C-alpha cells in the first residue's frame, strides 16, 4: 500500500470517529430506512454498453493530492448539467475533504441538478460510511481493494447491496483483481494510475482485461485523454470509462466529454 494511501486511510478512520460522534450510527440507520429508490448506477452502465455506446462515468473533482487544484471555478450543479447534456451515463463526485477538497454538499448539489446516477467517490472503510452514502443520496460507492481486507470487502459490499447501492470495486494489479472477482458485484474498475508512483499507463487495463469475467462491466479509470485512447480501449472491448481531470480542465466539461466520446470524423 502506498504512503499516500496509508495517510488517507489513517485520516479516514479519524474522520469516521468524528462524524459518528456528531451523528450516531443509529441515527443514520434510521434515516436510511424509508428513502426513495436509488437511480440504478450499474443498470445505467449496462444499458449504455448494450446500446453500443461508451458508458462514461464523468467525474466532478475540484482537486487531487498529486495535481492540487484542478478547477478553481468549481460549480458542481453546473458541471452535472453540462455532463448530462454531453452524454455522460453516470457521475462520480469526490466527497473526501482533506485530500481532494471534496464535500458531501457537492454530491447533493450535483445529483439534484441532473437525473444521472451518482457514485460517491471516497475511501470507504467502515459501515458508517455506507449508511452515510445512502443518506446523502449516492447511488453507488467505491471500494478500493488495496485499502481493504477480504472480510471488509465482503461486509461493505453486502451492506451496500442491502441498502440498494451499487458498488464499484477498484483494483490496480492482478492480485487485487483476483480478490475483487470474489465480490458479487457487476462493476470492476481498473485504475491505470499507480498509487505508489502516480504514473499512468493504459496498458494496465489492457494487461488485465482478459482476467475480468465476461459478466462484469470493466471500467477503465485514469489516463483517458484523446479519442485515440478511447478507440484503443474500445477495440479491446473495454467500453466503460471513468474520466475526471481531462474534463475538469475544459471550459465546458460536457462539451469536452462529447468531443472525446461522441464526436465522429
Curated annotation (Swiss-Prot):
Catalytic activity: 1-(2-carboxyphenylamino)-1-deoxy-D-ribulose 5-phosphate + H(+) = (1S,2R)-1-C-(indol-3-yl)glycerol 3-phosphate + CO2 + H2O
Domain of life: Bacteria
Pathway assigned in UniProt: Amino-acid biosynthesis; L-tryptophan biosynthesis; L-tryptophan from chorismate: step 4/5
UniProt-listed InterPro entries: Aldolase_TIM (IPR013785), Indole-3-glycerol_P_synth (IPR045186), Indole-3-glycerol_P_synth_dom (IPR013798), Indole-3-GlycerolPSynthase_CS (IPR001468), RibuloseP-bd_barrel (IPR011060)
GO biological process: L-tryptophan biosynthetic process
GO terms for MF: indole-3-glycerol-phosphate synthase activity; phosphoribosylanthranilate isomerase activity
CDD domains: IGPS
Keywords noted in UniProt: Amino-acid biosynthesis, Aromatic amino acid biosynthesis, Decarboxylase, Lyase, Tryptophan biosynthesis
E.C. number: 4.1.1.48
PROSITE patterns: IGPS (PS00614)
Record has Amino-acid biosynthesis as a keyword: yes
PANTHER family hit by this protein: INDOLE-3-GLYCEROL-PHOSPHATE SYNTHASE (PTHR22854:SF2), TRYPTOPHAN BIOSYNTHESIS PROTEIN (PTHR22854)
UniProt family annotation: Belongs to the TrpC family.
HAMAP family tied to this protein: IGPS_B
Listed name of the protein: Indole-3-glycerol phosphate synthase
Organism of derivation: Xanthomonas axonopodis pv. citri (strain 306)
Gene name of the record: trpC
Amino acid at each position: 500500500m502506498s504512503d499516500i494511501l496509508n495517510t488517507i486511510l489513517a485520516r479516514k478512520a479519524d474522520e469516521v470517529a468524528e462524524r459518528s460522534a456528531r451523528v450516531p450510527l443509529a441515527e443514520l440507520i434510521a434515516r436510511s430506512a424509508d428513502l426513495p429508490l436509488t437511480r440504478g448506477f450499474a443498470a445505467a452502465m449496462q444499458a449504455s454498453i448494450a446500446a453500443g455506446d461508451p458508458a462514461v462515468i464523468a467525474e466532478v473533482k475540484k482537486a487531487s493530492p498529486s495535481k492540487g487544484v484542478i478547477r478553481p471555478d468549481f460549480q458542481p450543479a453546473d458541471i452535472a448539467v453540462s455532463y448530462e447534456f454531453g452524454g455522460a451515463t453516470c457521475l462520480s463526485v469526490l466527497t473526501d475533504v482533506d485530500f481532494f477538497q471534496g464535500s458531501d454538499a457537492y454530491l447533493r448539489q450535483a445529483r439534484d441538478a441532473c437525473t444521472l446516477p451518482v457514485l460517491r467517490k471516497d475511501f470507504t472503510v467502515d459501515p458508517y460510511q455506507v449508511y452515510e452514502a445512502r443518506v446523502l443520496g449516492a447511488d453507488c460507492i467505491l471500494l478500493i481493494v488495496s485499502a481493504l481486507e477480504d472480510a471488509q470487502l465482503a461486509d461493505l459490499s453486502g451492506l451496500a447491496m442491502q441498502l440498494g447501492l451499487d458498488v464499484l470495486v477498484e483494483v490496480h494489479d492482478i492480485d487485487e483483481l483476483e480478490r475483487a472477482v470474489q465480490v458479487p458485484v457487476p462493476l470492476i474498475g481498473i485504475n491505470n494510475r499507480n498509487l505508489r508512483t502516480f504514473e499512468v499507463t493504459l496498458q494496465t487495463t489492457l494487461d488485465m482485461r482478459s482476467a475480468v469475467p465476461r459478466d462484469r462491466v470493466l471500467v477503465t479509470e485514469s489516463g483517458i485523454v484523446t479519442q485515440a485512447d478511447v478507440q484503443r480501449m474500445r477495440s479491446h472491448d473495454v467500453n466503460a470509462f471513468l474520466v475526471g481531470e481531462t474534463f475538469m480542465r475544459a471550459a465546458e466539461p460536457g462539451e469536452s466529454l462529447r468531443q472525446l466520446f461522441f464526436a465522429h470524423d
